[in-house]
């Protein structure tokens, strides 16, 4: 069994503190029980199989044919799902167990149903195409018929008008006119015409191209169809125009036909005879009625077939997915030399050994195998996967940690502390118990409806909110807590726990100033005294309070991170990291910023007027100068000199000893000597394992180790300053949230109230609600969430968390049943 360390006694036993102890197991499974064994292990979901055939392509593996079969069945099931979705036929809940049906029977049944459904669809498509063509033809007959009818009427009217004019002219001119008519009638040209429909968006270009191609020797008329029509070729609705093109000559006709084809214009025959047109419309209408009846009958038959499929759809779907997953896993197993057994290797938690052996035994019995499977644990130097047992409450927090990087095997897990610190730091920036209650109500809806919502397909944003519902619950509860401390309810203070400790000295005292206020009662018991809100000194006081509080919280969390590095070093038995990483880092951080935190607390307790900026700056610039009025306690100057010296000494202690000790250990190991003062460290093992491959003497890159340590030291020293400053975002975002709340309340709600107009008040309330929800409950929540994320990923986790492991991914059927392929 692979173990990276054994000194776990320094921490209380908890499931999330360190990942589960893993083991590399080997399974030797008889061929006749292999399928059932993998199926039972998939139900168990506690074995991560290794691919022992990685050098083979997918087509060269033993069960490639079975996977191809399952893939074909999965294709048919996807086809059924699409058809059911289009027809609006729901799949019924799964009835029975997938183990009760045989895969061969499913394959035959799916093939029969697909063939029948494809035939019905083909017939229906053919009928629907004919129906759509006849609908277009009917529209052409109607619209073009209207054009020809109006043209005939116009020509008749014009003829009558011409005849009446000619009757009144001189009789001597009549023979000449008759002669001219006879001459013109002999020179008349026979015009042809084409009718059809063209997409409306192409109609203008279509007309222009026709005109240019025939050099203007055409006459075209178009009529708009009010309602969209279904195109016979694409089957989609489209807006179209009916066109009639008159031309002269076969050459022009061939050009027009080619242009119609290029523009996707559907052409239909048309007769000039009005009687024939009416007859054709009657015939087309009758044919449409017949087709409609036939299509409806076909759709009814198809829906009955789809309902039959829907009854068994989920069962077949799960069966095919499970079988495909089983055969994929079987392809990762190797055949032994006798070709009678399959050999599997994989990672599993130590606690699951008994369950795995029980599954192997059940598979052997249920498959009537003459020989049982063999379970044995292998020794290995490979790094095991990381596995944390989580529940629906802790899984979201663990996902937040894993998004930065998966913990190294049995490395201390930041998620244990993040469960509390993440929502708390969020709430420091989002401290308003009114807003907290709003988020709490929304979260309670997600939690109370979680069973219903879990079975539904949600949108991306809703799915993220639902997955992190318990994180949001903690965020809302802590927001209510910090909001009570800040005494803010939508920026309004309430004396919830007691009256204000201060009161006006006389009647002339204004509420907008603290001048003249005297303390008449005990100190306000919890949180901020409401008298501060609205006073002239409110902003300076809150700025000072929140800024100092941010530094205290930041230094505390960074110290926690460094302390966790000690537990890691002790667990992995790395004395070098304890003496030359943990101790110097603690000294450096607390000599500077730990000291600043102590000064803040002393100043709060004593009410001193000392300038802490001046104290910290001149601690470096002029350490020998007297502090004067900035002195907070006796011998402060001496203490500062000692702390400054310790901080300076701790830097070379972090940088120099560790690389030389690792080099000394490496040399002693290869000379057969034991290095007595210090235990073998995790870093030296890492160098040995990865330095020289399979050679007898691994190469030790001292320069690489030294540069790495130099970078790590510089990063910590500079990070101690920048990370502490980074925690000031707690103050900045808290102030921004408070000021935005105040602006929305005073400049929107109170302003609307002051007009004494119901309409303005309603508008003001609506604007206030939308601004509160959109800006404060959505944008500000997201902003505070991201800043809290940054504080944990960078400022906290970089003190101890390597995060270079890989996640335990067991073979399981849990997700197979819920996810699409």
Curated annotation (Swiss-Prot):
Phenotypic effect of disruption: When associated with VHA-a2 disruption, day-length-dependent growth retardation associated with a reduced accumulation and storage of nitrate ions in vacuoles. Increased sensitivity to zinc ions due to a lower zinc ions sequestration in vacuoles. Reduced calcium content. No effect on sensitivity to sodium ions.
Encoding gene (name): VHA-a3
Cytoplasmic side: 2-421, 491-548, 603-640, 780-821
UniProt record similarity statement: Belongs to the V-ATPase 116 kDa subunit family.
Expression by tissue: Expressed in etiolated seedlings hypocotyls.
Protein's membrane topology: Multi-pass membrane protein
GO CC annotations on file: chloroplast; chloroplast envelope; Golgi apparatus; plant-type vacuole; plant-type vacuole membrane; plasma membrane; vacuolar membrane; vacuolar proton-transporting V-type ATPase, V0 domain
Keyword terms of this UniProt record: Acetylation, Coiled coil, Hydrogen ion transport, Ion transport, Membrane, Phosphoprotein, Transmembrane, Transmembrane helix, Transport, Vacuole
Subunit record text: V-ATPase is a heteromultimeric enzyme composed of a peripheral catalytic V1 complex (components A to H) attached to an integral membrane V0 proton pore complex (components: a, c, c'', d and e).
Domain of life: Eukaryota
GO molecular function, one term: proton-transporting ATPase activity, rotational mechanism
Predominant cellular place of this UniProt entry's protein: membrane
N-acetylalanine carried by residues: 2
Transmembrane segments: 422-442, 470-490, 549-569, 582-602, 641-661, 759-779
InterPro entries attached to this UniProt entry: V-ATPase_116kDa_su, V-type_ATPase_116kDa_su_euka
Protein name in UniProt: V-type proton ATPase subunit a3
Vacuolar-side segments: 443-469, 570-581, 662-758
Residues recorded with modification Phosphoserine: 174
Biological processes, Gene Ontology terms: proton motive force-driven ATP synthesis; vacuolar proton-transporting V-type ATPase complex assembly; vacuolar sequestering
Protein localization: Vacuole membrane
A Pfam family assignment: V_ATPase_I
Known function: Essential component of the vacuolar proton pump (V-ATPase), a multimeric enzyme that catalyzes the translocation of protons across the membranes. Required for assembly and activity of the V-ATPase. Involved in vacuolar nutrient storage (e.g. accumulation and storage of nitrate) and in tolerance to some toxic ions (e.g. zinc ions sequestration in vacuoles).
Coiled coil: 97-144
Source organism of the structure: Arabidopsis thaliana (Mouse-ear cress)
Keyword Membrane in record: yes
